[in-house]
Amino acid sequence: MTEKKNRREKKNPREAKVTFEGLVTEALPNGMFRVRLENDTIILGYISGKIRSSSIRILMGDRVKIEVSRYDSSKGRIIYRLPHKDSKRTEDSKDTEDLKDTKDSKD
């Protein structure tokens, strides 16, 4: 009886996928992107349903985690948008603070 039970167990479909980190190089229509992986391979990535439903914006230059099937390595599903290490917003705010300091010193 246990032998039959073992044969009926389904394999986890996530085992057939490999996760990479990559950089979005081009935005295409309908939630599709060109992504350059860590090994310099460029693949076509599409947004997962969870990212689409939570309205997370993915733009050119964003770092993402992408899930690639072992059977078709030319396409992948974007499952996570990684946070920026060096955000332009923080650099811009520093620049504006420097400008304010120089204006104050002139007065």
Swiss-Prot record:
Residue ranges of the region described as Disordered: 81-107
Biased composition (Basic and acidic residues): 83-107
GO cellular component, one term: chloroplast
Source species of the chain: Sorghum bicolor (Sorghum)
Pfam families: eIF-1a (PF01176)
Superkingdom of this protein's organism: Eukaryota
Keyword Plastid among record annotations: yes
Name by which UniProt lists this protein: Translation initiation factor IF-1, chloroplastic
Listed GO MF terms: ribosome binding; rRNA binding; translation initiation factor activity
Subunit structure: Component of the 30S ribosomal translation pre-initiation complex which assembles on the 30S ribosome in the order IF-2 and IF-3, IF-1 and N-formylmethionyl-tRNA(fMet); mRNA recruitment can occur at any time during PIC assembly.
Function comment: One of the essential components for the initiation of protein synthesis. Stabilizes the binding of IF-2 and IF-3 on the 30S subunit to which N-formylmethionyl-tRNA(fMet) subsequently binds. Helps modulate mRNA selection, yielding the 30S pre-initiation complex (PIC). Upon addition of the 50S ribosomal subunit IF-1, IF-2 and IF-3 are released leaving the mature 70S translation initiation complex.
Compartmental location: Plastid, Chloroplast
UniProt domain S1-like: residue ranges: 8-83
Family membership noted in the UniProt record: Belongs to the IF-1 family.
Keywords in alphabetical order: Chloroplast, Initiation factor, Plastid, Protein biosynthesis, RNA-binding, rRNA-binding
